Amino acid sequence: MDILQSLNGRQKKAVTASPGPVLVLAGPGSGKTRVLTHRAAYLMSELQVQPFHMMAVTFTNKAAEEMKKRIDALLGRHTRGLTVGTFHSTCAGILRIEAAHIPVNQNYVIFDADDQLRVVKQVLKDLNYNE
């Protein structure tokens, strides 16, 4: 499959840009995820960039899984070593790996919205504050 075949001119320009960060600003449904997946596949297949030298981040777990599937489909193989995840999971992974280098307890927990609400309610209860 030709990685560039289904892309328009602007998308091709972003996909084939020199290796390094690329900023793509576009509205919903304009093909940003398509550009990101095609760029990852292009860099690996055409420029022999190693997967462990790249990272693709998005906002949802569903989108991250879809990106992985699309990249694998474009390349016709499973891509090992490529980091694809949400902003939160990717940053949490970096923190877990690098926590030894900063003054942070390595057993920290990242709270989601439900966890945060539960803690605030517990604190208010502990302070005898009526809602």
Regions found by a protein language model. Name each.
Residues 1-106:
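P-loop NTPase Walker
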Residues 97-131:
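DNA-processing P-loop NTPase/helicase core
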